[in-house]
Design a protein with these regions (language model features):
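Acidic/histidine-enriched segments that form metal/cofactor-coordinating
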Residues: 17-25, 29, 94-95, 99-178
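His/Glu-rich zincin catalytic helix
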Residues: 2-101, 125-128, 138
Length: 178
């Protein structure tokens, strides 16, 4: 009886190894298929020097943004924090749009507007329907070129940024990787 149980156990192990190999093979095929289906990135340069990277995924949605090579690494003692500060101020309104108008326009498009600052870059981007890309580009251009920097908004954002800095400084992982 013990030999019979041992034989069944060995057969079960052999079967399970086979199942595991098939799972790995299928997983590898899925990864390979996914990598092969990533759309090619087309990089072009406009007459004004602006580089444009685009991909056609065939989806009805798009992400469009500005990746500016000016992050915290580009700062010095005199202008420390300016990239992060300007990122925060970008959505406070422009010469053409108040903050409320900007928010309503983006919301009515069903879009999402956001920004972030890293060591290398400051990024402003919009997620929207593909048909709304021209409007999203126009809004982003307006924000980058015509942001208003009102005294009350500056004071309010200053306290927000100082609070964010305290949160980062209290997170040991953030401090170590900084």
């Amino acid at each position: 009886m013990a030999l019979r149980v041992l034989g069944v156990t060995q057969n079960l192990r052999t079967y399970m190894r086979g199942v595991e190999i098939i799972k790995r093979y299928k997983s590898a095929l899925t990864v390979k298929k996914t990598l092969l289906n990533i759309p090619a990135t087309q990089v072009t340069q406009l007459d004004n020097g602006l580089r444009v990277a685009s991909e056609d995924s065939g989806a009805s949605t798009a992400t469009v943004g500005l990746w500016i090579d000016a992050g915290s690494r580009s700062e010095n003692d005199r202008n420390n924090g300016v990239a992060h500060f300007l990122e925060h101020m970008a959505f406070k309104g422009t010469d053409k749009r108040s903050q409320t108008d900007l928010e309503l326009e983006v919301e009515n498009m069903g879009a999402h507007l956001n920004a972030y600052t890293s060591r290398e870059q400051t990024v402003f981007y919009a997620k929207c329907l593909s048909k709304d890309v021209p409007k999203a580009v126009e809004i982003l251009a307006d924000i980058i070129q015509n942001s208003q920097l009102g005294e009350s908004e500056i004071a309010r954002e200053r306290s927000v940024i100082l609070r964010e800095m305290q949160e980062v400084e209290s997170n040991l992982q953030e401090v170590v990787f900084d």
